[in-house]
Amino acid sequence: MSTPDNRSVNFFSLFRRGQHYSKTWPLEKRLAPVFVENRVIKMTRYAIRFMPPIAVFTLCWQIALGGQLGPAVATALFALSLPMQGLWWLGKRSVTPLPPAILNWFYEVRGKLQESGQVLAPVEGKPDYQALADTLKRAFKQLDKTFLDDL
């Protein structure tokens, strides 16, 4: 995935962008066959909730049973890295420019929002997945569900 040239995205801001993207993306069942975000967001939220206790349990279990500390630490670090991997992927995806097929659909949804009387900020540069998430979130609130029939 490539990032737009006009934005400087460092490693740590990708986590923040991923968190924002996961909160912005509408988790609608009709989007799941086309976009992988629904699955990634659900699994990332699951990992954020359950992987830290699993990491602590793994360490405590190995220490209590007198096992080796090295494999326990490696397993705990792997468990702790899973939520970070999900947030990093979502952050990277949020700044990825839209492919041509989705770009056309993005402009159609924006057009339908504008036809319904919504005031939208102009798109700066090439739209990315974060712009799509913002537009879809607004479309699900303002429009009826038939705007997805073209997808």
Curated annotation (Swiss-Prot):
Q: A GO biological process this protein is involved in?
A: negative regulation of chromosome organization
Location relative to the cell = Cell inner membrane
> GO CC annotations?
plasma membrane
Q: Which domain of life is it from?
A: Bacteria
Q: Name one Pfam family in it.
A: DUF412
Q: Which UniProt keywords apply?
A: Cell inner membrane, Cell membrane, Membrane, Transmembrane, Transmembrane helix
Q: Does the keyword Cell inner membrane apply?
A: yes
Spans within the Periplasmic topological domain: 66-68
Does this UniProt record's set of keywords contain Signal? no
| Parts of the chain on the Cytoplasmic side | 1-45, 92-151
What residues form the membrane-spanning segments?
A: 46-65, 69-91
According to Swiss-Prot or TrEMBL, what is its membrane topology?
Multi-pass membrane protein
**What family does this chain come from, according to its entry?**
Belongs to the UPF0208 family.
| Protein name (Swiss-Prot/TrEMBL) | UPF0208 membrane protein YfbV
| Designated gene of the protein | yfbV
